[in-house]
């Protein structure tokens, strides 16, 4: 392959715990590669992948785990917090609700800004945004001196009601930047201009906590690649690397968001509107539900810390191909959340002796050692067997039964995740198709579907690198929000239109400042609505049809809210008044890149098996034909038992299932 030159290609990059995926879209064709991740320097795996595909330049879009790992591993910057005097302990106090109501030993996560690094400043803005006490500039000078003496690496600023009037936060920002130019500083009125001081403070502290490391990584990667890089946000759109460095909290679920975008658009292209996506990589599994749209939330919790920014609604469990199996203190088999990663990796990698889900699938024959990554990486089945035999001895079983047990446990973890995002949110999983992706997702698809009553599995052409594809084709987006606290009345339509007009003007200005053509800029409007007196809201799309007056608007949003409330919580109450809490705007510059399609023609011949080997389905070993996915023809039925292999995954077709390929090279597995 010759070197790929600028403006001829689009490159999607997704860094996982085990592999880093690179996808190249060039001349309406897709080329993919997977290289081992390099945890000590994640950018090195990116460079290795680009070299493998001989990519020298192009348009780069990156799904990154730097912010995620920094938060999960507590390896962020020494962070100071400046807040309104008397509110220094808001991070410590938090909310009264407990994550596990009946756990007497529940451990709250330590605040990311410890007590001696939290500073109170004399100032006050009231609930109408009016300054009633000026900022104490002399005290601010003392605080800055204390921060400088403490060797703090970053500062977060969160003042009461700054979302209504950010003047004091902006003044603090300018003063710090003039005194300590090298210090990383975030202010809450820029990151999340919304009410609820605990969640707002937590979000801006997280931003400052992960900021220096993300900023350093972005600078390092941009220097190595020598071209601008866009970065995937948790909300499913891309931003510049500069904005990602300034607001890295928006990238907390960067990679998983790319996967959902790739899954949703691939399914939509094939005419499938309702999917449950399940991204099973090396370390974890990310599950999301798309009922004819990608679902977003504005209130999330990561590692015990609340984050109030728009994110695709994703539920994550510690169940991946590299998840380690062991016997716990109670003598039971457990799988995960610890992962073997890429180094040393599963036992079959030949480096360590960790027993993982990948080893179990290999021993059961669902992964064939000579077909892994297209035969470019040979797996050591003897090492896997030796490692799993030790586990089997502990539980007095055979190696095969131990492997089956590992699969059952990890499947149970994923089944619970599917229930959480479907049944617990008012959706029947039987109404959806399962779309498994990631390197390990398809291996578990038939069993998961059978347990959940799902009758259709949809597998796109490149499931192992679908997150990288989603990252590459994502729209350019930016989210805006503002707290309004409106009870619908005669002036509601005018008030909301005024807010939206201001945000749309800001969006155009922001996109223009990035040198982007805004002629195709679109705006999606949303409202956070609740019943008066509730402490939680639901995200409701703002009506798009022409609205005559505030009365019609009130009727429309009330109906939409009550429908959503009924689905989510099982009831609604038309006698209760509603309240608009926040207005939200998503500015979207649609991607011009479409998913390349194969358009397979029907053939008179059919793809033949390349081999036949014993494979365990449930507890039974069956002689099973093995097919190369590329050999399977349009509308050719592959009845289970069968194993379909390709570069980035393996697909066991269980007895009672049949696989069929469509003209876009997608595989559909259905119950016979």
Region locations from a protein language model:
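N-terminal glycine/serine-rich phosphate-binding loop of ATP-dependent small-molecule kinases
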Residues: 1-79, 133-155, 170-188, 212, ...
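Short glycine-rich, Thr/Ser-proximal phosphate-binding strand/loop in the N-terminal lobe
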Residues: 13-42, 111-128, 378, 478-487
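C-terminal, non-catalytic interaction/recognition modules in large multi-subunit enzymes and RNPs
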Residues: 15, 138, 142-146, 272, ...
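Gly-rich Lys/Arg/Thr-decorated short loops/hinges at beta-loop-alpha junctions or inter-strand turns
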Residues: 23-31, 97-102, 111-131, 152-153, ...
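Glycine-rich phosphate-binding loop of actin/hexokinase-like ATP-binding domains
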Residues: 33-38, 80-86, 106-108, 247-254, ...
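ATP-dependent carbohydrate kinase catalytic cores
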Residues: 42-43, 49-50, 189-196, 200, ...
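Active-site phosphate-binding/coordination module
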Residues: 77-126, 130, 188-192, 470
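Terminal amphipathic helices with adjacent charged low-complexity linkers/tails
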Residues: 158-204, 542-544, 580, 585-603, ...
